[in-house]
């Protein structure tokens, strides 16, 4: 499998913040409590969580966690020009990018400033980089390469009902984007369509042909 799982103990003593780096991980995918050691609660996002390859605990949470992650893999970097004309939002898909590591300005073309997360950034959910507010630049973009990109797959929410489609060949979908929308209802990533593990989902009337990218076992 491209992703690995193991049990790791992380402990917040005296209710203080603590963290632990998963040495062979490039990105943690999920973290769940297997055996709580503390009287204090362990709540995802409040008293434990993760960012990139680092696990953290706080507020007295002490537990053994099941941690699944992408092991360290070779990265690829490329220079890509992305431009916000007339101060409008624009985006560009980075083909083959599974998880972005960083995006830095190499050569700014615009008078407008380019500030990370304000006028440029990236979305791991659909392998996309974006600019806004007049930022135009050549960016150095580094990322983990993806393994498999499929042809289009139709997933439809009929009568505004929630619907799913499993990709048996996938162990972990990392992006999903609309290729051809059939519904009048909007298809918005994270709201009316998305993915979990190897399953694509739609809701609230979104019907479209999607192009998912994924790791395969």
Swiss-Prot record:
Activity response to pH changes: Optimum pH is 6-7.
Known glycosylation sites: 30, 102, 126
Glycoprotein listed as a keyword: yes
Keywords, sorted A to Z: Disulfide bond, Glycoprotein, Hemagglutinin, Lectin
A GO term for molecular function: lactose binding
Keyword Disulfide bond attached: yes
Temperature dependence: Activity is stable up to 60 degrees Celsius, then decreases and is lost at 80 degrees Celsius.
InterPro entries: DUF3011 (IPR021381)
Transmembrane domains' residue ranges: none
Maturation and modification: Contains disulfide bonds.
Disulfide-bonded cysteines: 5-187, 42-68, 61-77, 114-135, 142-206
UniProt record, GO biological process: positive regulation of erythrocyte aggregation
General function of this protein: Binds in decreasing order of affinity: galacturonic acid, D-galactosamine, methyl-alpha-D-galactopyranoside and further galactose-containing carbohydrates. Has hemagglutinating activity against human and rabbit erythrocytes.
Subunit structure and binding partners: Homodimer; disulfide-linked.
Name recorded for this polypeptide: Lectin ADEL
Organism: Aplysia dactylomela (Spotted sea hare)
């Amino acid at each position: 499998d491209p992703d690995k799982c193991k049990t790791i103990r992380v402990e917040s003593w005296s209710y203080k913040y603590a963290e632990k780096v998963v040495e062979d991980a490039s990105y943690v995918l999920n973290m769940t409590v297997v055996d709580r050691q503390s009287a204090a609660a362990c709540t995802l996002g409040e008293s434990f969580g993760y960012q990139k390859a680092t696990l953290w605990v706080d507020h007295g949470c002490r537990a053994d966690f099941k941690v699944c992650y992408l092991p360290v893999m070779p990265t690829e970097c490329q220079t890509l020009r992305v431009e916000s004309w007339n101060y409008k939002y624009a985006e560009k898909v980075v083909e083959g990018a599974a998880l972005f590591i960083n995006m830095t300005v190499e050569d700014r073309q615009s008078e407008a400033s380019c500030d990370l997360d304000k006028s440029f950034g990236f979305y791991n959910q659909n392998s996309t980089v974006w600019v806004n507010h007049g930022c135009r630049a050549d960016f150095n973009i580094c990322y983990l390469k993806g393994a498999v990109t499929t042809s289009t797959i139709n997933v439809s929410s009929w009568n505004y009902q929630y619907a799913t489609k499993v990709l048996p060949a996938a162990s972990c979908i990392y992006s999903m984007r609309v290729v051809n929308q059939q519904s009048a209802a909007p298809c918005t990533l994270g709201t009316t369509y998305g993915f979990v593990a190897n399953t694509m989902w739609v809701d609230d009337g979104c019907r479209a042909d999607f192009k998912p990218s994924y790791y395969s076992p």
